[in-house]
Regions:
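Extracytoplasmic
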Residues: 44-46, 74-78, 108, 118-122, ...
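C-terminal partner/receptor-binding element of secreted or periplasmic proteins
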Residues: 154-182
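A short, solvent-exposed beta-edge/loop patch
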Residues: 126-161
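Short Gly/Thr-rich strand-loop-strand
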Residues: 103-129, 175-181
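Bacterial N-terminal signal peptides that target proteins for export
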Residues: 1-10
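C-terminal motif of bacterial Sec signal peptides marking the signal peptidase cleavage site
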Residues: 17-20
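Bacterial signal peptide processing site
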Residues: 22-25
């Protein structure tokens, strides 16, 4: 336990220190998505995380016991997460329409791989790819309580995503492995 704590503490301190220093994901990255959340009324930002390649590289060097996680962290160029609380007076139907429009408006190199729509909520997962790799992943989701944007940038292969979690059912893991990228 203490050994694990000694490994985690330096990484946690780096996260705190570098988040204040502007070590963030670059908007010039091909997998970057600009979330224009300023256009939405009735939102209060709860969480905003932006981690760039320097911190991800440090984190990768400190993952000794999981080669899959280490390889994934080393391949990442940036991770951005924004979570907003939705106020009671916000127009939820309008927010859902905005999120749907934002997902649809991404350029033609972005491919929607998941769309879930239930009542007054919606979620989209999109990937941007080249012929060889996935360059970016974007998640846009809204429900009655929060609006969430996630953007993961880096050159990822479907096999990396397949190996990421043993919780992925076998059929979905096979779909990731054979996902066409061209």
């Amino acid at each position: 336990m203490i050994n694990t704590l000694c490994k985690v503490m330096p990484v946690a301190m780096l996260v705190v220190l570098t988040s204040a220093c502007g070590v963030t994901a670059s908007s010039r990255n091909p997998g970057y998505v600009s979330f224009n959340e300023a256009q939405y009324d009735g939102l209060r930002r709860d969480t905003s995380i932006s981690i760039g390649p320097a911190l991800l590289s440090i984190a990768a060097r400190h993952v000794d016991d999981d080669p899959t996680a280490r390889a994934l962290l080393a391949a990442l160029d940036g991770v951005r997460v924004k979570v907003y609380h939705i106020d009671d007076e916000a127009d939820l139907a309008q927010l859902v329409r905005h999120v749907d429009a934002a997902a649809t408006s991404l350029d033609d190199r972005w491919q929607r791989i998941v769309r879930v729509q239930e009542d007054d909520s919606t979620a989209h997962i999109l990937i941007k790819h080249s012929d060889e790799a996935i360059l970016g992943l974007a998640i846009l989701a809204v429900d009655e309580q929060e609006l969430v944007f996630v953007n993961v940038m880096g050159e990822l292969t479907p096999a990396m995503l397949e190996d990421l979690s043993p919780a992925i059912p076998e059929e979905q893991a096979l779909a990731l492995r054979y996902m066409p990228l061209n």
